[in-house]
UniProtKB/Swiss-Prot annotation:
It comes from Ehrlichia chaffeensis (strain ATCC CRL-10679 / Arkansas). Its main location: cytoplasm. InterPro entries: Aldolase_TIM (IPR013785), TIM_sf (IPR035990), TrioseP_Isoase_bac/euk (IPR022896), Triosephosphate_isomerase (IPR000652), Triosephosphate_isomerase_AS (IPR020861). It catalyses: D-glyceraldehyde 3-phosphate = dihydroxyacetone phosphate. Pfam families: TIM. This is Triosephosphate isomerase. Keywords: Cytoplasm, Gluconeogenesis, Glycolysis, Isomerase.
Length: 240
């Protein structure tokens, strides 16, 4: 698989700036010759706005519903996302799990729906700080793997330690590797990316971890300059 760099814009930005950001980012990536796939996951309203702005950038979404259609006010199906040009969809992000009480089983249903619609789900899992401090890291990760992952189809695993999301704190390389080893004991084939406080300063250390296929970037993806620095940094490490 190509080096995968995913931007999760969460609920930031506005309709006027989405396309200009995408065009500027695309122009900055013209000279990147490495085998890298850049994915933008904007708010739903921007999906149709940016899909044609940059042929060298893939479009993703931040969530989907597990039914393909029906009387589900306010929901967006994976089939709809595919029809507007999405290639990926994030499911199971901790903010969805904690704020909207999405269970592992709900995440699995969403992932299955995404696969059936022709999308590649990016399934987020990760431990809390309490899990790690109480010696429950392995149980926490394996429970999420078993209950969140579909049994068939292609998907990407996003390892995001809950305590690193939205912070300036990133786990040590040894801590990340320990978690990846646990995940790999359950799934030896799917690509794994890392998310949680990824920025220009730590990208080279993170992407140098052999088991990783890329990164999921939050706040540092909201500015073209910082996001490009992350992409360039990751590419440079993988090319050397």
């Amino acid at each position: 698989m190509s080096l995968l760099i995913v931007a999760n814009w969460k609920m930031y930005g506005d309709f006027l700036t989405f396309s200009s950001f995408t065009k500027e980012l695309s122009a900055n990536l013209v000279n990147v010759k490495a085998d890298v796939e850049v994915v933008l996951c904007p708010p739903f309203i921007a999906c149709s706005k940016i899909v044609d702005c940059a042929p060298n950038i893939k479009l993703g979404a931040q969530n989907c519903f597990y039914e393909s259609e029906g009387k589900y006010t306010g929901e967006v199906s994976a089939k709809m996302l595919y029809s507007c040009g999405c290639s990926y969809v994030i499911v199971g992000h901790y903010e969805r799990r904690s704020i909207f009480y999405e269970s592992d089983y709900c995440v699995q249903l969403k992932a299955k729906s995404a696969i059936d619609a022709g999308l590649i789900p990016i399934i987020c899992i990760g431990e809390t700080l309490l899990d790690r401090e109480n010696g429950m890291l392995k149980n926490a990760l394996l429970d999420q793997c078993y209950n969140s992952f579909p049994k068939h189809g292609e998907f990407v695993i996003a390892y995001e330690p809950v305590w690193a999301i939205g912070s300036n704190t990133i786990p040590s390389i040894d801590m990340i590797t320990e978690s990846l080893d646990i995940i790999r004991s359950y799934d030896s084939k799917s690509n794994i990316i890392y998310g949680g406080a990824v920025n220009q300063s730590n990208i080279k250390d993170v992407i140098a971890i052999n088991q990783l296929s890329g990164v999921l970037v939050g706040s540092a993806s909201l500015k073209v300059s910082s996001f490009c620095d992350i992409i360039y940094g990751a590419v440079n490490v993988r090319q050397n």
